């Protein structure tokens, strides 16, 4: 699994973080980014989802980080909806999402 927490702004000079990036730089862009997954039953050469032509927004099959985590659990044979208990003995699901079944062979 290889992902970052942000993409890059689709246009130079757009400041989204307030860090004062220069007019020829790109800033963080949390609305659309890429990831790579391999092994553990993932389809070889498969591309899932699509962004618009500028890479600023997903337009087909977006995957939320929760769904990615559920897919990782699934690949290990762990049900993402497994109930675990925290330090206060409160029940919690590992993740409230379903695995992205299209990723798997």
Predicted regions located by residue number:
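Ligand-binding pockets and gating/stacking loops
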Residues: 1-105
């Amino acid at each position: 699994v290889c992902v970052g927490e942000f993409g890059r702004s689709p246009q130079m000079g757009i400041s989204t973080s307030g860090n004062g990036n220069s007019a020829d730089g790109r800033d963080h862009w949390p609305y659309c980014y890429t990831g790579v997954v391999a092994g553990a039953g993932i389809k070889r050469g498969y591309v899932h989802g699509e962004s618009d032509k500028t890479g600023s927004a997903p337009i087909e099959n977006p995957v939320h980080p929760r769904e990615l985590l559920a897919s990782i659990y699934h690949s290990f044979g762990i049900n993402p909806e497994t109930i675990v208990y925290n330090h206060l003995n409160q029940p919690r699901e590992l993740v409230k999402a379903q695995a992205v079944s299209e990723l798997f062979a």
